[in-house]
Amino acid sequence: MSEKTFLVEIGTEELPPKALRSLAESFAANFTAELDNAGLAHGTVQWFAAPRRLALKVANLAEAQPDREIEKRGPAIAQAFDAEGKPSKAAEGWARGCGITVDQAERLTTDKGEWLLYRAHVKGESTEALLPNMVATSLAKLPIPKLMRWGASDVHFVRPVHTVTLLLGDKVIPATILGIQSDRVIRGHRFMGEPEFAIDNADQYPEILRERGKVIADYEERKAKIKADAEEAARKIGGNADLSESLLEEVASLVEWPVVLTAKFEEKFLAVPSEALVYTMKGDQKYFPVYANDGKLLPNFIFVANIESKDQQQIISGNEKVVRPRLADAEFFFNTDRKKRLEDNLPRLQTVLFQLQLGTLRDKTDRIQALAGWIAEQIGADVNHATRAGLLSKCDLMTNMVFEFTDTQGVMGMHYARHDGEAEDVAVALNEQYQPRFAGDDLPSNPVACALAIADKMDTLAGIFGIGQHPKGDKDPFALRRAALGVLRIIVEKNLNLDLQTLTEEAVRLYGDKLTNANVVDDVIDFMLGRFRAWYQDEGYTVDTIQAVLARRPTRPADFDARMKAVSHFRTLEAAAALAAANKRVSNILAKSDEVLSDRVNASTLKEPEEIKLAMQVVVLRDKLEPYFAEGRYQDALVELAELREPVDAFFDKVMVMVDDKELRINRLTMLEKLRELFLRVADISLLQ
């Protein structure tokens, strides 16, 4: 069967840059699934994406589905005909479904009986006939949150569509896709190359688009070119470009023919904190800042034009003129804000609502101040500095700089605090209170910052849960999942001696009578333990290991982490599987018994050598392991408990627990309870699979 290259290109108006990659990847995945479901043999499915087009190129696509043999078994002969040999209704219905009469059916004979049989040779449908619907279906399944409608048509897509190219080899596949009749005409760059031209064969794509249309359709190629050219441009001026992955992706999605250029701004603007300058360069203008080798911002930036110009200096000057007013605004705001102390913004916090039922930002500040001081006392941080940081924590939200450049919250608080002469750990805490901002982000660097970061997040968790507005489904408007995980990461990775129980109780207490949820403390703790589950699963821990620890509901995060590591190590021991099974057996035996057990094992009642040996070892280990449990040495404790495998196995092999003698039975049940209690000091080992 012959094979050809297939091309589909959807020419549009400018597509959303942040969604371009996902649209193209989904298009390719959807179309590949359509090909596979149709049984069409094919080679590589390559996707292309540029601001005004989505395209797929399929190598070695079969020209038709393979022919196939089908068999449909009908009713058994005994049910297919009546006593007179006439077809039954069941047989006639089956035959109609197959498109034949009962007389035309074959018969299938096996050792189990005889049935009616329909056998047919089905010729594979041509690829040409299948492609239009496959393309339309693939486009309809794209992850587009908001569709557009244009003109007088009722067609919907992410952006208006102007061209549809469907080529199988050199042949146009006739179709109407998204309201546009397919053709071999594609459009080039808006301002360079040929505005539109015909493509003769699918194999010519994307080279013909580059040569005649001045468009680099390959997304990864454009991105790599921007990265390489920007690095070279930065090197030429003795610096390093800030080529963050997210901005690289966005810029690659904004240009069809990237031309990297270098521009500059006045050095006087470097007196403004670099974070504000970088915010406007990256966030507003999509420029790449340039840093010197010592990490200081240089008065230069790199940008990407979408056109080759005979006068590049004109483009450079134009971009310099665009960014200058934004930098001048930042300079003005910075100088204006410093005319008063950060603390002077406190009264204005009373005018901003945190949440209708929970009060203003000033109310939140008072709670954070108190909670940060309480946390600092628990973890051995400077209480005065922590309460001072709490007092100033939201003051920068009232500054001109943060009002205009919102992403500079925190960092501007740090700069203004330094200007006011605040202690360095207080200033740093104002910036780091929002850390970690995302997965993998840095944690607060000093104890005061840790106290403030935990206080801010716990106040939000307690408040929102306290009024019954916990996250539901994918909706989490107050970012409570991120807040909970942030608190856990700080406590675990900084090994802080904090208990979620007392921490949550203190956060709730500071709200006074504002909260309406009577179960708020338990709800917050359960929610945070649930975040633990997600965290450790991401870290590669098995679900049953997590469940074994969660069963004990340890509320000290650092302690929880130690238990997780201990159980994970225990699983590697040879005795683990047998002891997990034994714990499960003990758990079941104890669950079925409703008898009141003794406080201790009565050694004089024990009879069998196996139970005597096990009872002695349980007593010895109980005394030996008490310091281990007190010090959180759970891994060492489980290693010691692993030595119980042989006596436990011997006990269950030789000793009957549920004997008629009540005193003996209760004694044996008590011993098993004491055995299980030792393991439960770490985790519920019976849950391990």
UniProtKB/Swiss-Prot annotation:
Its EC number is 6.1.1.14. The keyword ATP-binding applies. It is found in: Cytoplasm. One of its GO terms (molecular function) is ATP binding. It holds the Pfam family tRNA_synt_2f. Belongs to the class-II aminoacyl-tRNA synthetase family. PANTHER family: GLYCINE--TRNA LIGASE, CHLOROPLASTIC_MITOCHONDRIAL 2, GLYCYL-TRNA SYNTHETASE. This is Glycine--tRNA ligase beta subunit. It comes from Shigella dysenteriae serotype 1 (strain Sd197). The gene is glyS.
